[in-house]
Amino acid sequence: MAVQALREELDSKCLQLLSDLEELEAKRAALNARVEEGWLSLAKARYAMGAKSVGPLQYASRMEPQVCVRASEAQDGPQTFRVIKADAQTPEEVGPSEASLRRRKGPTKTKELGSAVVPQDPLNWFGILVPHSLRQAQASFRDGLQLAADIASLQTRINWGQSQLRGLQKKLKELDPGPA
């Protein structure tokens, strides 16, 4: 009876793995489409604004990331990747930065605790009125970044599923030395 349950679990893991592989193929195709669309929109913007108006000379001297990729690992599962805004605070960072007494009446000019620099939209590097194709390129690359994080999570889930599948096959071979 244990062999039959093990075979059923092996079948379900195999079906899950095939489903994940199919999803991975679809997401990779979507990522390729987003990146291709982004480069095409960027080329259209360069044509509309001129080659010298859209290039490395317009980049900010100090670039700040707008998003970060955060990896989180479950205790009993594979690692997952999420795209989050760079200025979003984690729960550990929320709250007062230091405990102190407040003065009710005192100097009116106080040091601001939350004076963090808000990341500027990179489209503003190229002027105030940018072509729509440049905005489309930014949106395509942003969507591509989310898809890349999804693909990385899916790939780790597939690798984790493959290792589980190998473990189940090994168990089955130990319990039932006949044809598997």
Curated annotation (Swiss-Prot):
This protein's GO CC annotations: COPI-coated vesicle; endoplasmic reticulum; endoplasmic reticulum-Golgi intermediate compartment; endosome; lysosome; vacuolar proton-transporting V-type ATPase complex
Tissues expressed in = Predominantly expressed in the heart, liver, kidney and testis and at lower levels in the brain and lung. Undetectable in the spleen and muscles.
Q: In the UniProt record, does the keyword Transmembrane helix occur?
A: no
Location in the cell reads:
Endosome; Lysosome; Endoplasmic reticulum-Golgi intermediate compartment; Cytoplasmic vesicle, COPI-coated vesicle
Q: Which UniProt keywords apply?
A: Coiled coil, Cytoplasmic vesicle, Endoplasmic reticulum, Endosome, Lysosome
Tell me, using the record's free text, what induces this protein. Answer: Modestly up-regulated by FGF2.
Q: Which residues form a coiled coil?
A: 4-38
Checking InterPro entries in the record gives: Vma22/CCDC115
> According to the UniProt entry, where is the signal peptide?
none
The membrane-spanning stretches of this chain are none
A Pfam family name for this chain?
Answer: Vma22_CCDC115
Q: Name one GO biological process term.
A: vacuolar proton-transporting V-type ATPase complex assembly
Region entry Disordered: which residue ranges? 90-113
* PANTHER family noted in UniProt: COILED-COIL DOMAIN-CONTAINING PROTEIN 115
Role of this protein: Accessory component of the proton-transporting vacuolar (V)-ATPase protein pump involved in intracellular iron homeostasis. In aerobic conditions, required for intracellular iron homeostasis, thus triggering the activity of Fe(2+) prolyl hydroxylase (PHD) enzymes, and leading to HIF1A hydroxylation and subsequent proteasomal degradation. Necessary for endolysosomal acidification and lysosomal degradation. May be involved in Golgi homeostasis.
Q: Provide the assembly information.
A: Accessory component of the multisubunit proton-transporting vacuolar (V)-ATPase protein pump.
Name assigned to this protein? Vacuolar ATPase assembly protein VMA22
The organism of origin for this protein: Mus musculus (Mouse)
Instruction: Give the gene that encodes this protein.
Output: Vma22
